[in-house]
Amino acid sequence: WERMCLVSLRALAPSLTRITVAAAVGAALHIGQGNPDLVDAKAVEFSRAVLTQTDVEGEVISCEGPKDNAPAFMRREKVGTGKGPKVEFVLDPVDGTTAASKGRKDAISALACAPAGCFQVLPDDGYYFKVATDYHSVNSISFDMSIEEIVRTVADEKRLHLENFTVIMLERDRHAEILQRLRKLGVRIILIPDGDIAAAVAT
């Protein structure tokens, strides 16, 4: 059964790509116009139109937007034609909405898709601690570790001294303590205003 699911999802790859492309096209219509909600609204509209034609029995279990009162998919929204594999989606039609509205780089359309029941649904009324790295250290770190332990472990796996190791993080007031701890650790730090998914891809 697991192999069948993998084959089915692999076959969906072109359709999933069309969904994110549609979101990006919708957002691109309003790049630099200073209206983040319009960027979001068009990205949602365009991606929903493609999802409606996608041969899946799908459900949106989580999406970016509601906590910011921005245009978004509805949680538990049913999507797809109702034919094909049962899947669930986590959707962010535009990560970096503000960046797109100001004509800046690193806005990106993203989604995750898995067989129904695979994703853990978390409350979407707050922020979560996230770490992105490459395959070298993915099995060596956990959220039970301190930020210092995580950074040291990833740097060791990459065979880098801390002074040559770079951490990218969003510049937010809520990250002030983590930023202070990282500076004490001696790593290089790049603070970005938006677009942490694009930063994660860069790792």
Locate predicted features.
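Solvent-exposed alpha-helices and their adjacent loops that cap or buttress functional pockets
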Residues: 52-53, 78-84, 92, 101-104, ...
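A short glycine/serine-rich beta->alpha loop
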Residues: 9-13, 98, 135-139
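DPxDG-like acidic metal-binding loop motif
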Residues: 84-95, 99-120
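Acidic beta-strand-loop-alpha-helix segment within the catalytic core
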Residues: 112-192
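Short acidic loop-to-helix transition motifs that present clustered carboxylates
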Residues: 67-69, 174, 193-200
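Short, charged, surface-exposed secondary-structure boundary motifs
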Residues: 122, 200-202
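N-terminal subdomain of lithium-sensitive/metallo-dependent phosphomonoesterases centered on the IMPase/IPPase/PAP
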Residues: 1-90
